[in-house]
Amino acid sequence: MNDYFRIKKIKGYQILDSRGNKTIRVKIETYGGISETGDAPAGASKGSREAIELRDKDGGVTRAVELVNTLINDSLRDFDVRNQLGIDQTLIRMDGTPNKSRVGGNTTIATSIAVAKTAAKAMGLEIFQYIGGPRVRYLPIPLLNILNGGLHAGNELKIQEFIIIPLSFDSFHEALYAADEVYKQLKGIITEKYGKLYTMLGDEGGVAPPLSKTEDALDLVYTAIKNSGYEDKIVMGIDAASSDFFNGSQYEIDGKKLSPDEMIDYYIQLASRYPLLYIEDPFNENDFERFSILQQKLKKTIVTGDDLFTTNIEYLKKGIEKSSAKGTIVKPNQIGTLSETFEYIEFAKKNSIKIIVSHRSGETEDSFIADLAVGVQSDFIKTGAPARGERTSKYNRLLEIENDYGIEYYGKKIYL
């Protein structure tokens, strides 16, 4: 074995995420002197089937750090850092639970990411090249969450994310800069209508105006698109995160209590008024049937599962059997290792499910998911508004990849 690639030491650190919460960073060093780090993000709105985070009673991650510095360091020392599958399988066996509850999904994903980044660096490759090899041909379409509600903001909106999607552009940078124009236009509209106070940012960089009704938020976003002159190039989307406003039998939204069947009509009405290409988690995480009904009724819309699937093949299989969704969110920390993430993506692609690689609301400045999205040739990437360093780090990395490697932006070609 080449010592240059062998793991010499693995160390854990406690760091802060973008919400000021503690999370774990893992650093790997090889005998060849190569080192890299991986960070674990954290969500505010979580699916109940996600991998469990290992946290202290006070919210810290000192137990996770201790596990990295002892058990994981001892178990993975001398592994070839290029053996991603072998290392991830060791982490999975070490944990021994179906939801990573012993070692913690945050512990395993930070380690798994650090492994991939160290291997890429040791091989002299960009991370996206290491992941994707010669198949890398295009850059993903960004889904920019420019107006925040739900658990990501302090207003009364139930819908969590109001998204713009810059499809019809010849390059990634043109698409991103146009979306940024819309974002600035939206801030100007809100300043004029509600005052500058309400251009303060939510967790994912979007504005959080004092609204309570979904259509009022959609009107603001659509007006910003039209005022920017991009009505024929930028479409819209929402992440309802509807499990968060489902009371067990009804959805409490816009001052009303709607039955699950009434929610189908609710989304159909929204899609008739606005250019909604994308609807994520329109129903609670167990309602595969109504996901399917909505997807059948809105054939041109990408109904997408996040809490529905939680990057877990078993739930994706169920969704495919029921034709529940055209798209799936991919969040590596939901499943806990990159190898399981790659397996999930491969299965989704084989079944013609669109891939949306996604951040979490609690992020760090690590730009890894930008490389991941390019490497796996994700259709879309979801990483917040064009604001706040933990969001722009991902966009800036995509701009860097485009500039340095001339990789194309397929825009609406991916969808059409």
Swiss-Prot record:
Enzyme class, UniProt record, top EC level: lyase
Annotated cofactor note: Binds a second Mg(2+) ion via substrate during catalysis.
Record's catalysed reaction(s): (2R)-2-phosphoglycerate = phosphoenolpyruvate + H2O
GO terms, biological process: glycolytic process
InterPro entries (UniProt xref): Enolase, Enolase-like_C_sf, Enolase-like_N, Enolase_C, Enolase_CS, Enolase_N
Enzyme Commission code: 4.2.1.11
Pathway stated in the Swiss-Prot or TrEMBL entry: Carbohydrate degradation; glycolysis; pyruvate from D-glyceraldehyde 3-phosphate: step 4/5
Binding site for (2R)-2-phosphoglycerate: 160, 331, 360-361, 382
Alphabetized UniProt keyword annotations: Cytoplasm, Glycolysis, Lyase, Magnesium, Metal-binding, Secreted
SUPFAM superfamilies to which the protein is assigned, alphabetical: Enolase C-terminal domain-like, Enolase N-terminal domain-like
Cofactor list: Mg(2+)
Positions with a binding annotation for Mg(2+): 239, 280, 306
Cited PROSITE patterns: ENOLASE
Entry's family note: Belongs to the enolase family.
Protein name: Enolase
